[in-house]
Structure formats: structure tokens, C-alpha cells
């Protein structure tokens, strides 16, 4: 089940998030692939083989186990002195480094984009990376680095093409600015750039840039020894949790906090940011996807976070995921300079005993989600 947290101002100091469930979503699940890796010597003779099954994004959707086997064999046999294990390890490390550099984006934290987007210039084939826009290239069933490709009828496509809205990801701390003011009446949402005659156009011409910063005062902070994949839902859009933030072990990353008074409205109601948080050690390409039942990743991740501002105050939430009651392999708490309320998820319990989640109001200063 996917749901969006709506932050509302209550008469009490503590806000309680409201939830709704859309009637439409499109699932992009990574398909399992069987890969046979064959090691050969300088004469081309097989010396060792290994078969693995995984949900891999390393191969394109058109690539089969046979072609992966052939590629691995030729790569390893190219030098009689090569170490096949080291070669594969190097390839994996290179791939991970490429993904990391891609999702980090090109802007330093809270540095404004400087180049206005030009309508009718960029081809629809791929997302126009830069100025805060990042490509998401591990989603099975989507090409070009897009996060959702959908038209007004709810039809989806592998490729961004004429008549479709092509949604995109922004780097951590930023939010997309593009969605049409006229939304479908059936409750689904659409967002992104519009493809017309093979070129990309803004669907919201009130904003010259594709990404914008939210509040500067909320961060994710890690006090643990493994990375955490924090996955924002693509909204307005499919609501699939494929917008990545990587919280490095012992590091910090900005949290996207949208202003509910000015950001996208769903049927007139204010909306906020929602994240699905995977167990520590799960990579963004494995965790920032639409997961499968029991997988523990994506929409089955153990923790959901909410953030947003309205009326000059910021609201931060820890929300139970009804898909997954298992406790994560970390604890998490919200702390700040001036907050009303107490909110933590420790040893599988909210605030020590509850199971209904919790919300705090940030009156002033900074706040953070601390993983410990």
C-alpha cells in the first residue's frame, strides 16, 4: 500500500499526519535474472563457473544470461595474467562509484541553480541531467533515467514520448518543480516535463528551474557504520519510492522539506515529502524501487518518514509501514533546537511503547533525523 502524508495544523502543538491512498499506481519492479559467470584461462578453457540469481540492474532489460556469460568470459580471457575475482570486484566497485556520483548531483548544498531550463531544446530520450536534476537508471521498465512516464489517462511507457509527462529526480534536499496545474479527476497525479514533437517542455512555466531547495534546517545524520538508502516517493507521479538519498555511514545528507502552502496540492489539500527507509546496508539501486512482498525494500522497507512545512512551522514524522512490521537494523530519533513533542523509533517501538508513529513540531532552528 502506498500513501501520502498530509500535514495539517492542529490546535495542539503536535501535528498528526493525515493519510490517503491513491487509486492508481504503476509498479516498476526489478526482474530477477540468472547469471552464469564463467572463468577461463588464457587458452579459453573453462576453469570455474558460478551461477547466481539476483535482481540486477547491471544488465539492460534486453540482455540475457547467455550474453552476460559471454561478456564475462571474453573480459576475463583477454589477459592470461588477469585475476578474474579482482576484475569482477573492480567492476562492481566502479559501478557503485558511478551510481554514487550520479545521484549526488552537481550543486553544492543549498546552492541555487543558475541555468534556466529551455523549452523545446532537449530531446525526450533522456532526462536533462544537471542544475540539480539527476538520472535514475536502475529502474526496470523505464529508460532514459526517468522516474515516472505517464499520460493523463494513467497509461505508462518505457520511453518518454509525445503526449506523456516524464518525471525526474532531484538531488538530496531538492524537489522537482514541474507538474501540470490541471490534474486527472480520478485521484491519480501526474508530474514532470511534457514531451511534444520529440522535445521536452515545462509543464509548470511559473518556474524556470527544474529543481528547487526546501528548508535548509533539516538533515539526516548517521551515527552507524553502514550506508542507508532513503527513498522518496515520486509525487506528483507514480508515487514509487525511487528518488534516492544516500546517507553515508557516519555522514549527513539534507532532507527535502517542501512548503505545503506553496507546493503541489492534491485536490486542494497540502502535501508533504515522504520517504521509505531501507535497512542499513541496502544500496540505493536495490532499495529505491517498488519492492515485492516480503523483500524488505522499497515500499516494504521498515521505516517511513514524513517532512513538510506549513504556516511557518516544520513537521517531521516517523510513520509505521503497514507492509512491514519488522524492526530495522538501526534506531532513529528526531532531535532539534526547539521542538514540541518527542519522537523516536527504538528497538521496534515508537517512543518506547507505541506502534502508531509520532510527529514533532519544529518551532525554530534546525532539526535532524538521527540514525543510531
Curated annotation (Swiss-Prot):
Tree of life domain: Eukaryota
UniProt keyword annotation of Nucleotide-binding present: no
Q: Keyword annotations for this protein?
A: Carbohydrate metabolism, Cell wall, Cell wall biogenesis/degradation, Glycoprotein, Glycosidase, Hydrolase, Polysaccharide degradation, Secreted, Signal
Q: Say yes or no: keyword Lipoprotein present.
A: no
Which Pfam families is this protein grouped with? SUN (PF03856)
How far does the signal peptide extend, from start to end residue? 1-15
> Where do Low complexity bias regions lie?
52-85
Point out the coiled-coil segments of this chain.
none
Residue ranges of region Disordered?
A: 51-85
Stated EC number for the protein is 3.2.1.-
The protein's location, in the record's own words, is:
Secreted, Cell wall
Q: Which residues are glycosylated?
A: 54, 351
Inducing stimuli: Expression is up-regulated during biofilm formation and down-regulated by RIM101, CYR1, RAS1, as well as by host macrophages.
GO MF terms, alphabetically ordered: hydrolase activity, acting on glycosyl bonds
A GO BP entry is: autophagy of mitochondrion
Gene Ontology CC terms: cell surface; extracellular region; fungal-type cell wall; mitochondrial inner membrane
Q: Could you say which protein family the record assigns here?
A: Belongs to the SUN family.
Q: What's this chain's function?
A: Cell surface beta-glucosidase involved in cell wall maintenance and cytokinesis. Plays a role redundant to SUN41.
Q: What is this protein called?
A: Secreted beta-glucosidase SIM1
Q: Which organism is it from?
A: Candida albicans (strain SC5314 / ATCC MYA-2876) (Yeast)
- State the taxonomy lineage: Eukaryota, Fungi, Dikarya, Ascomycota, Saccharomycotina
Amino acid at each position: 500500500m502506498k500513501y501520502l502524508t498530509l500535514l495539517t495544523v492542529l490546535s495542539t502543538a503536535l501535528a498528526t499526519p493525515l493519510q490517503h491512498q491513491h487509486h492508481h499506481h504503476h509498479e516498476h519492479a526489478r526482474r530477477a535474472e540468472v547469471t552464469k559467470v564463467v572463468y577461463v584461462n588464457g587458452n579459453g578453457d573453462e576453469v570455474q563457473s558460478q551461477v547466481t540469481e539476483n535482481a540486477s540492474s547491471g544488465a539492460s532489460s534486453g540482455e540475457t544470461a547467455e550474453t552476460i556469460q559471454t561478456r564475462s568470459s571474453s573480459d576475463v580471457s583477454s589477459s592470461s595474467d588477469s585475476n578474474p575475482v579482482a576484475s569482477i570486484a573492480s567492476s562492481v566497485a566502479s559501478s557503485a562509484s558511478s551510481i554514487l556520483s550520479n545521484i549526488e548531483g552537481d550543486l553544492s548544498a543549498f546552492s541555487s541553480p543558475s541555468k534556466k531550463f529551455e523549452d523545446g531544446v532537449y530531446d525526450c530520450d533522456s532526462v536533462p541531467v544537471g542544475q540539480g536534476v539527476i538520472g535514475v537508471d536502475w529502474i526496470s521498465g523505464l529508460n532514459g533515467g526517468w522516474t515516472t512516464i505517464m499520460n493523463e489517462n494513467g497509461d505508462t511507457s518505457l520511453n518518454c514520448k509525445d503526449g506523456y509527462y516524464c518525471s525526474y529526480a532531484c538531488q538530496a534536499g531538492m524537489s522537482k518543480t514541474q507538474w501540470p496545474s490541471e490534474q486527472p479527476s480520478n485521484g491519480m497525479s501526474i508530474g514532470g516535463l511534457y514531451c511534444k514533437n520529440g522535445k521536452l517542455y515545462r509543464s509548470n512555466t511559473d518556474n524556470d528551474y527544474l529543481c528547487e531547495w526546501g528548508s535548509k534546517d533539516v538533515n539526516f545524520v548517521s551515527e552507524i557504520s553502514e550506508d542507508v538508502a532513503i527513498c522518496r516517493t515520486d509525487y506528483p507521479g507514480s508515487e514509487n519510492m525511487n528518488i534516492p538519498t544516500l546517507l553515508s555511514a557516519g555522514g549527513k545528507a539534507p532532507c527535502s522539506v517542501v512548503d505545503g502552502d506553496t507546493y503541489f496540492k492534491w485536490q486542494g489539500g497540502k502535501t508533504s515529502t515522504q520517504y521509505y527507509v531501507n535497512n542499513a546496508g541496502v544500496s540505493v539501486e536495490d532499495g529505491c524501487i517498488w519492492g515485492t512482498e516480503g523483500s524488505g525494500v522499497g515500499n516494504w522497507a521498515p521505516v517511513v518518514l514524513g517532512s513538510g512545512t506549513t504556516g511557518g512551522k516544520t513537521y517531521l514524522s516517523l510513520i509505521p509501514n503497514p507492509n512491514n512490521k519488522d524492526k530495522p537494523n538501526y534506531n532513529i530519533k528526531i532531535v532539534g533546537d526547539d521542538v514540541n513533542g518527542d519522537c523516536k523509533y527504538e528497538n521496534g517501538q515508537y517512543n518506547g511503547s507505541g506502534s502508531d508513529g509520532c510527529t514533532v513540531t519544529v518551532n525554530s532552528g534546525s532539526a535532524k533525523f538521527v540514525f543510531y
